[in-house]
């Protein structure tokens, strides 16, 4: 079994890459693929680049060239749901776009025409994650949260951005810039997927400073959770 793991930035894949005993590196269209093993599993680790187009391009190349049986997305996110703290981990059971509006043609806000309104994380992987992280976070100051993640081609930090997202997605937990695009490609290739992100900022006016300060913590939390999950697959 080959497992595809995707992170947008070097910081989000570095820890995982450093656990690989040997690596074959392939670069296609600016997307960087690292082929090797993590936790005894065959993996293709992708550094896709930031944003929906880069994520979709990289995921398509991953699916077409390397034929993964599972896709997992790692990285950081802005916590917009109540009670979230920096370092918490969000496991997405649903994803949607926060900046797609074709409602004039009868689609739900956030829905790309002829695509589902929400992309569902794989039920089997979600169940595995729930079991693992309940034990992993039992004695931690951080926690794992399950819920809706919204993807925008914008860094979310302003009140007006919050208002739009909450108007259409009142149960949103976190925001970021790639996951729904990854989920859409996985859906179109019929590949089970799971999105695991750690909170690097609270998507507020201090978000830029918080992101710069805590991106490595978020990347570490997310990577550790993925390694623990790989051990069970």
UniProtKB/Swiss-Prot annotation:
Which Pfam families does the protein's record reference? PNP_UDP_1
Q: Which Gene3D superfamilies match?
A: Nucleoside phosphorylase domain
Annotated keywords: Amino-acid biosynthesis, Hydrolase, Methionine biosynthesis
Instruction: Please report the organism this UniProt entry assigns to the protein.
Output: Listeria innocua serovar 6a (strain ATCC BAA-680 / CLIP 11262)
Question: This protein is called what?
Answer: 5'-methylthioadenosine/S-adenosylhomocysteine nucleosidase
Gene Ontology MF term list: adenosylhomocysteine nucleosidase activity; methylthioadenosine nucleosidase activity
The answer to whether UniProt assigns keyword Amino-acid biosynthesis to this entry is yes
Q: Which PANTHER family match?
A: 5'-METHYLTHIOADENOSINE/S-ADENOSYLHOMOCYSTEINE NUCLEOSIDASE, 5'-METHYLTHIOADENOSINE_S-ADENOSYLHOMOCYSTEINE NUCLEOSIDASE
């Amino acid at each position: 079994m080959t497992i595809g793991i995707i992170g947008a930035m070097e910081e989000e894949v570095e820890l995982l890459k450093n656990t690989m005993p040997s690596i074959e590196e392939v670069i296609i269209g600016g997307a960087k693929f690292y082929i090797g093993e993590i936790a005894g599993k065959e993996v293709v680790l992708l550094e896709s680049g930031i944003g929906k187009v880069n994520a979709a391009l990289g995921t398509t190349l991953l699916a077409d060239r390397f034929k993964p049986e599972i896709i997992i997305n790692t990285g950081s996110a802005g916590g917009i749901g109540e009670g979230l703290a920096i370092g918490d981990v969000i496991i997405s059971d649903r994803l949607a776009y926060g900046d797609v509006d074709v409602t004039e043609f009868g689609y739900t806000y956030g829905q790309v025409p002829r695509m589902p309104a929400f992309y569902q994380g794989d039920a089997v992987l979600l169940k595995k994650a729930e079991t693992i992280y309940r034990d992993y976070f039992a004695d931690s100051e951080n926690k794992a949260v399950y819920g809706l993640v919204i993807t925008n081609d914008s860094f979310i930090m302003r009140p007006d951005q919050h208002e739009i997202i909450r108007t259409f997605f009142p149960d949103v937990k976190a925001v970021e810039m790639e996951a729904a695009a990854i989920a859409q490609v996985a859906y179109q290739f019929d590949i089970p997927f799971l999105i695991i992100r750690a909170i690097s900022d609270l998507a507020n006016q201090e978000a830029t400073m918080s992101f710069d300060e805590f991106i490595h913590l978020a990347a570490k939390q997310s990577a550790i959770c993925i390694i623990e999950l790989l051990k069970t697959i």
